Amino acid sequence: MGFFITFEGIEGCGKTTQLRLLKERLVALGEKVTVTREPGGCPVADQMRAILLDAKNSAITPLAELLLYAAARAQHVQEVIVPALERGETVLCDRFTDATVAYQGHGRGLDLSVIEELNTLATGRVQPALTVLIDCPVEVGLSRALARIEATSGAKEERFERESLLFHQKVRDGYLALAAAFPERFVVVDGSGDVQQTGLLVEEALRRRMQSLGKAGLTEVKAGC
């Protein structure tokens, strides 16, 4: 079986950039890597992503939002993640089940036990071996996210960026609560700095954790590639 790593964090934390950099390092080391994301990652789930993230769809209720995420995840896990792991690849996923707990659970206030049941049903109990949480203050993350939207002439995928500071603080608190509850799976990295600074922190955190897990190849990752 392969090795499953997820990247999590609030809007604008820099997780997508750090995931891409890690992929480049691993490929340079000869690792077979599948990079994917949620919501989305395959054609059916990408259609649900378009609905979930389009700012025009502000009328989506919290429950409908939760169920759409679960449906997209069920398709994604079976079509992309499980086959890649069975091929022995390292899977890097931009958001996974923890995002649903943080956003729909802590952010929207939905029942965490219901979310846990849906996540289990959607994933078939597939879980990441390691989750990298890129953490930064809400104000920093949203400033970056809004700057990115302006730079792309108003991207459509901005429904969550339009939520209140309080919502995003609840999401951040939810992520930190998850990291505290599952320290054997999470590594928390300060994402307040620039890309290079955060990359160095990710590199060191991964090296320490991979050594403890006995994953030899991943202990060789170097930042700045």
From Swiss-Prot:
CDD domains: TMPK
InterPro entries, per database record: P-loop_NTPase, Thymidylate_kin-like_dom, Thymidylate_kinase
Function: Phosphorylation of dTMP to form dTDP in both de novo and salvage pathways of dTTP synthesis.
Xref: PANTHER family: THYMIDYLATE KINASE, UMP-CMP KINASE 2, MITOCHONDRIAL
Gene that specifies this protein: tmk
Catalytic reaction annotation: dTMP + ATP = dTDP + ADP
Lineage: Bacteria, Pseudomonadati, Thermodesulfobacteriota, Desulfuromonadia, Geobacterales
EC code: 2.7.4.9
A single cellular component GO annotation: cytosol
Molecular functions per Gene Ontology: ATP binding; dTMP kinase activity
TM regions (residue ranges): none
Cited NCBIfam families: DTMP_kinase
Keywords per UniProt: ATP-binding, Kinase, Nucleotide biosynthesis, Nucleotide-binding, Transferase
A UniProt-annotated Pfam family: Thymidylate_kin
GO biological process, one term: dTDP biosynthetic process
Protein name: Thymidylate kinase
Organism: Geobacter sp. (strain M21)
Family, per entry: Belongs to the thymidylate kinase family.
Residues reported to bind ATP: G9, I10, E11, G12, C13, G14, K15, T16
